[in-house]
Amino acid sequence: MLLSDLSSDQEATGSNSHGGGGGDRMVVGSHGAAHVVLSNLFLPPAAAAAATMLLPAAPVMVRPAAMAAAQEPRAKKKRSLPGNPDPEAEVIALSPRALVATNRFVCEVCNKGFQRDQNLQLHRRGHNLPWKLRHRAAAVSAVTTAAPAPRKRVYVCPEPTCVHHDPARALGDLTGIKKHFSRKHGEKRWRCERCGKRYAVHSDWKAHVKNCGTREYRCDCGILFSRKDSLLTHRAFCDALAEESARLLAAANNSSSITTTTCNNSNISSNNNNNNINSISNSNNLLITSSSSSPPLFLPFSTTPAENPNPNQLLFLQQHQAAHHQLLLPQFQQPPSSPPAYFDHLAFGGGGGVITGSSCNDDNSSIAGDVMVAAGGDSVSFGLTSEGSVTMHAGDVGRRRLTRDFLGVDHDAGEVDELELDELPADLSTTAAACQGCNFAAATTAACCATDFTTGSRQYLGRLPPVNETWSHNF
């Protein structure tokens, strides 16, 4: 299709492909024929420049002032605060009985009550009874005469102690003053059956019952909340309480651990002395420990045996490496003192004794290190084998055993199996006599249950359990 055909069709119909009158340009050819050029691309360069100069200026769009004002952010109108009435308003004080009265206006036909007379008048129309609605005097006076507008009414609370009892803080709505008096000063007569919450205003109760139980917000402590903001407020206090409880518990645990270590270290310092103790040889009840350089022995008595009514205490020997020496307080690193009272109790009161030594002057001694021998009527006996390991024997055959199962590993009798006495080497009885001239001294390693001194590893012979952190933090 030629451009001339397109132009003739548009002239006949009066249409424009671009929808605007100024979109197409009329160009007159050399033969007088009019042509409509849809775009400057169809013209030669000289003609395109001339056509551009002939174009009218583009119209300038001007926004109306109303549209400009509509798009600008409008300042939100603030609601008047409750209790700040118009100074020109009429102040009305109703009695508490009038505020709490319900259904004051009753229909004489069906005995249905209404809170306002206007509602009763509208109800009377259904019974074909005469009814009359009260009109404001302003509506009547506006038609007849130019009377002034009526004053606005505000209501004060009848409770003298209430903040809204002051006319300057009166409420401007009759329904509002009624609900205020019921909520703040009235009886809460409506109770929720789900949560037990009570309300003084029936509409408040209905709104609560509608949503109660539909949404639950549970705290980690188990308390349920129906509102998220209540949960967030509670969680702030709950988390703070949990952190405080955890901090106090950690402090209590640290204090208990320090107290146990201090008590044990006090027993160590009391055992370090340079006095020799006479040995009481008892082949059935011996407590012997040995090491290359013997440490102070841990005898964790809660009280001394003289104060403890149970003379059959289970003695635990704990191991302290050189790395733990800084735990000893300066008060426990004092010059050695006299033997403690419970050594005398073991030696003379229970038919046994304790012998400790730092070095044996006797060349016949087979123990390379310090030796401690404890003997009693019922005690735990240790023995050093020829291979360099320590064995344990508890009590005599036929007597009550002292190796109680405090950790609960033996569910049958509550006690740990004993080692036979004949498993101990025969030269243990001579060890005590060989070490009578030994002195008390500090050491670096003590045996617990059974220790292999050649490899440095612990061996638990029989069914003796390892001591957990309740007894000592070193095991």
From Swiss-Prot:
Residues reported to bind Zn(2+) 2: C219, C221, H234, C238
Tissue specificity remark: Mostly expressed in developing leaves (more in sheaths than in blades, especially in the outer epidermal cell of immature leaves and in the region immediately beneath the meristem where internodes are visible) and panicles, and, at very low levels, around the shoot apex and in roots.
Sequence motif Nuclear localization signal 1, residues: 123-130
Record Pfam families: C2CH-3rd_BIRD-IDD (PF22995), C2CH-4th_BIRD-IDD (PF22992), C2H2-2nd_BIRD-IDD (PF22996), zf-met (PF12874)
Phenotype when the gene is knocked out: Never-flowering phenotype in the rid1 mutant. Extremely delayed flowering under both short- (SD) and long-day (LD) conditions, associated with reduced EHD1, HD3A and RFT1 levels, but increased leaves and nodes production. Levels of FTL1 and FTL4 are slightly reduced under both LD and SD, expression of FTL5 is down-regulated under LD, whereas FTL6 is down-regulated only under SD. In contrast, the accumulation of FTL11 is slightly higher under both SD and LD. Reduced levels of MADS1, MADS14 and MADS15, downstream genes of EHD1.
Sorted UniProt keywords: Activator, Metal-binding, Nucleus, Repeat, Transcription, Transcription regulation, Zinc, Zinc-finger
Record-linked InterPro entries: C2CH-3rd_BIRD-IDD, C2CH-4th_BIRD-IDD, C2H2-2nd_BIRD-IDD, IDD1-16, Znf_C2H2_sf, Znf_C2H2_type
Induction details: Induced by FKF1. Down-regulated by DLF1. During the basic vegetative growth phase (BVP, photoperiod-insensitive phase), suppressed via phytochrome-mediated light signals involving the phytochromobilin synthase HY2.
ZnF (CCHC-type) residues: 217-240
Residues engaged in binding Zn(2+) 1: C192, C195, H208, C212
Main location: nucleus
GO annotation, cellular component aspect: nucleus
Biological function: Transcription activator that acts as a flowering master switch in both long and short days, independently of the circadian clock. Promotes flowering upstream of HD1 by up-regulating FTL1, FTL4, FTL5, FTL6, EHD1, HD3A and RFT1. Seems to repress FTL11 expression. May recognize the consensus motif 5'-TTTGTCGTAAT-3' in target gene promoters.
Protein's name according to its UniProt entry: Protein EARLY HEADING DATE 2
UniProt source species: Oryza sativa subsp. japonica (Rice)
